[in-house]
Amino acid sequence: MARLPAWLRAAALAAAVLGVGACAVTPPLSGRAPLPPSTVPPPPVVESVPPPLVPPPPFAVTPAPTPPPAVASVVARAAGNAIALILPLESPTYGRAAAAVKAGFVAAAARAGASARVQVIGHGDDGVLPAFAAAVQSGVALAVGPLTRDDLKTVFAMSPLRPRMLALNQADEAAPLPAGVYALTLAVEQDAALLMRVARSEGVNTIAVVGSDAPFQRRFSQAFVAAWRREGGTAPREYRFDANPEQLGALRRALATQPIDAILLAVDANDAALAKSFLRGRVYASSQITDGLPAQMLYDLENVRYIEVPWLAEPDNPAFAGLPRADYDDPVLERLYALGIDAFAVAQMLAEPTPPDRIELDGATGHLSLLPSRTFAREGRVMAIHDGRVLPESPAR
């Protein structure tokens, strides 16, 4: 079977997993409804994925028992300082994404000399409840996970006793997190809000949106428009991107009649160069705009700005010294690897007997700030394409 082009593989995986925060993609980042209360899933399979690039010292792994009986929802008392990393490593759909997060997490733990503190608990598509029961039974100070939105909803709804948690997704943007739960995600909404602030700081007052029907791109453009409106901006005109020559001609004519300062381009990398050729002025785009593109095609994206995680934006940053570079050939997995790195850095602080009320750090996924809602605000790096090169600009903060 022929190997898919890099951009197509990246786009497909991104549609499934890059929205690991607040996603509504196809399939959503779990793809399964929560289990009915009477269903007891099989025990999770522990630690059967390939080792990370630089194998850390061995981890303690606890087998998962049957979930505890239903009682009032409470945070379990810690019996030590161990950190459990709970991921769908055995899932056919999300196993690769989970393995990338795990690789970043254990690499960061090894660099910190804290490998012995980490327990890795892998599970399949229906095994998140036994996995959390195992973490409770072993008395961990903190559980990192779940990774998928549906698994997180399942834990919230059906796990009455759970450790303090650092979730890697968010069940519902509007709902407050339960007691003892924190959230660190790669939510595209945060990138869209930062890009909106960049546009405002550059004097953009009127903007149009040109986007595809891809779920990730629709989420990105909707988040940008919502942030734009919250800041008092007028509702932008929105145009659907269609590669049909007649439709492209109509798009060019429509944009020519509108006095706008900039355009938000929400398309995948394979459509980016064609779409950009019909656009004039400032162009802002999603982080996938360059995923898998050959270097020569970057010349067609001159002056496009987007948000990227520092792990990819600044590979020579001294802050990342001592962390192995994963050879995924896939920016989506690289971003998830970076999420694992930051998850460990945050987990060390949250696993303290009394977690800090304030956390600020410059991480592999961006500048992280703990909010009163116990979610982490994340600001990536602003990137600009000039003369066929992608360069980071000054931080927008």
Segments from the language model and where they lie:
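Segments of small-molecule ligand-sensing domains
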Residues: L323-S394
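Bacterial Sec signal peptide processing site at the extreme N-terminus
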Residues: V17-P43
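Short beta-strand elements in bilobed, periplasmic/extracellular small-molecule ligand-binding domains
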Residues: F105, R111-D125, P178-Y182, V209, ...
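Sec-dependent bacterial lipoprotein signal peptides
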Residues: M1-C23
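Extracytoplasmic ligand/sensor domains, especially the bilobed periplasmic-binding protein
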Residues: A141-V210, A214-A223, A227-R237, Q288-Q296
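Extracellular/periplasmic periplasmic-binding protein-like sensory domains
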Residues: K276-I341, P355
